[in-house]
Amino acid sequence: EPSTADDDADADEYWYYLKSSGKVANGKQSNVKGQGFVFGNKDDNFGQMLTNWVGGTKDGDSYKYEEIGGEDSVAQLSDYASNGVVYYCMYDEDKADGHIQKNKWRKTWRPEDAYEEDEDEDKYWYWLEKDGKAYIPDSDDMKATGYAYDLGDGALEVDGSQFSFAKKKINSKDYFFNADGEMLSDFVNVVHTEDANVIDLGMYYFGGSSDGSMKTGSQTVKDDNGDSFKFYFGTKDNNTTGEAKGKGVTGNKNNKLYYMGHLVAAQDYKYQPVFMDVAGNGEEATFIVNQNGSIQHSALEYKEDGDILIDAKTNKVEFKTKNSSSKVWDKYSVEKGSLIINVEDIDEKDVMPISTDVIASGSVTSGSKPQ
């Protein structure tokens, strides 16, 4: 049987399955000793048991199957998205017999890297459906484009160029996948969407590479140095407030100030001012925050070691007692009067430096097993 180790097997030898009639099986076979297998049905692979990444190209009412990848292969899983199917038939002489993997996560190499098999960090997570088909998004699934980010040395850093991706719910959790069916992780900034009801513009977080599920609510994330940073992402979709599930909050949330999900807090002084475009219309609201990111809203002198950092008393500054609208979260920003500021303000783009050409704003335009 295929699961039996054979150290003397020649590289050009293949496994075949003979039906009760004595004929060699070919194509997808759903019940070979209770498991599904895929056998070649092309002239150059007829009857050969196909393993690892297997692609089927539509041919009339059936498919023509072949192994994807190899040392000289340039094939991508996305090549089969619109007119084919992809299976993962895990084969290991000691552990797996080559049957179709179903209804599970599988961490493995891309087809073009399958023969290297030397770096675990080059593996990606894929989702295999109940029928065994690997989830490879087609053009109808690809609802958004954006950029991947890593939290490097205290700042989010762009990882690669703009790309397209799809959103999929698996076991009640939301995931993003790229065109080759690779699960995304870390941060993704959505800058273009075809349907804001499916994926809204903004920053999202999916945990580390061993997780990948969309995060909501308060999150603490460590950068490459092990330093912790706080974020807040929407917990549900709410058309009234503009909150979107998983999307990083900008503005006042629970009296803390956030920019695209990142907590904005005083760093160099006990208190610092922040000028932030909360509404996304180019107009900046003025806030005062402390070192915990809590928004201050009293008309007094904000001091440190006897020095006045920010004076909201002299000009009798008034602060907003509620948001300007249901979708503009600027409560406790300055409404009347002007602050006397004796310290540097916090530039949220320094805290979270995202180049302006990839900041999502405005309206819609046309490890271990994942948890």
Q: Would you name each region that the model predicts?
A:
Residues 1-371:
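Extracellular adhesion/carbohydrate-binding repeat motifs centered on closely spaced tryptophans
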